[in-house]
């Protein structure tokens, strides 16, 4: 493996998933021995004010602007073309030129749909092998450009969608979505139960409640769940300190049945002891669930990639989608009481996992880039 290649990984923090995938690929590059790897949050570096405003609007779309985001997501996918989206095609152009001049990359990897990168090739004539690592279980056309050399996708479904719009089969590889390696490592669960003071003889429900405040009335839900002596509830609030504080009294009263946590670095540990999880259908979280085999209850997916992700998992018997708050409690209690359905869902979601995605992707990218470089040299000499 030629680890002397210079790698530039571009991302954007519209949701944590794109950044997390970039970080995972960076760390895999380091493990493989690459000496020159750079990660750039291109839009943030290019125009911090615009980036922060649009990130704020993006996050708000999860709670108060769902219909606007639905119109944007599906509308752009239908009318997407270069003329109408000329401004987007140029976003980050100056900063990209600076990064290319500074780092002289042999490879560019996108974990966010940045069309400025393949457009850079068209405008300058400079051919830098460019690869898109897609972070959802669906396709949006904004990822697609004739100057992207290869796409790395989660499933055969996404590959089929790319082929339908004219992408050559050799330019698409099904690899899964890169996730942190600890999710694919074996680990005894006994110490984890002990660490969180949970019983292995009772069901564990994990509620990922910190993400953008999407799940409402968490306290009311927990008040009902703790009435069941056979269920232990773990609520991860992330950086949502207000939510954590609002649950503190209930936790104090039900310490053996309710655990309220803030940010959890080793969230994979909780996944290993969880019988089912309530979460939002982000591509990374769902991929992490496939690695360990955690059935998921997906609450009120936002129209767009979340809704498409949720549909994909529900259609394959790996998730239950709940669109009304009053249905959550019934869905959770019914699932936890039904061993056959739990077992089937665990198998179904585990079957969706593709292991070692980051390693597979980087090895293929290196092979593809070397082939492209050889072709370019042969073309010059001919």
Swiss-Prot record:
GO BP annotations, alphabetical order: enterobacterial common antigen biosynthetic process; glycolipid biosynthetic process; lipoteichoic acid biosynthetic process
Transferase as UniProt keyword: yes
Gene3D superfamilies named among the record's database cross-references: Glycogen Phosphorylase B
Alphabetical UniProt keywords: Carbohydrate metabolism, Cell membrane, Glycosyltransferase, Lipid biosynthesis, Lipid metabolism, Membrane, Transferase
Chief localisation class: membrane
Knockout consequences: Cells displayed reduced and abnormal cell size/shape, no effect on flotillin cluster numbers or size.
GO molecular function: 1,2-diacylglycerol 3-glucosyltransferase activity
Primary enzyme class: transferase
Pathway: Glycolipid metabolism; diglucosyl-diacylglycerol biosynthesis
Recorded catalytic activity of this chain's protein: a 1,2-diacyl-3-O-(beta-D-glucopyranosyl)-sn-glycerol + UDP-alpha-D-glucose = a 1,2-diacyl-3-O-(beta-D-Glc-(1->6)-beta-D-Glc)-sn-glycerol + UDP + H(+); a 1,2-diacyl-3-O-(beta-D-Glc-(1->6)-beta-D-Glc)-sn-glycerol + UDP-alpha-D-glucose = a 1,2-diacyl-3-O-(beta-D-Glc-(1->6)-beta-D-Glc-(1->6)-beta-D-Glc)-sn-glycerol + UDP + H(+); a 1,2-diacyl-sn-glycerol + UDP-alpha-D-glucose = a 1,2-diacyl-3-O-(beta-D-glucopyranosyl)-sn-glycerol + UDP + H(+)
Subcellular location: Cell membrane
InterPro entries: Diacylglyc_glucosyltr_N, Glyco_trans_1, Glycosyltransf_28_UgtP, Pro_diacylglycrl_glcsylTrfase
EC number per UniProt: 2.4.1.315
Family: Belongs to the glycosyltransferase 28 family. UgtP subfamily.
Entry protein name: Processive diacylglycerol beta-glucosyltransferase
Source species taxonomy: Bacteria, Bacillati, Bacillota, Bacilli, Bacillales
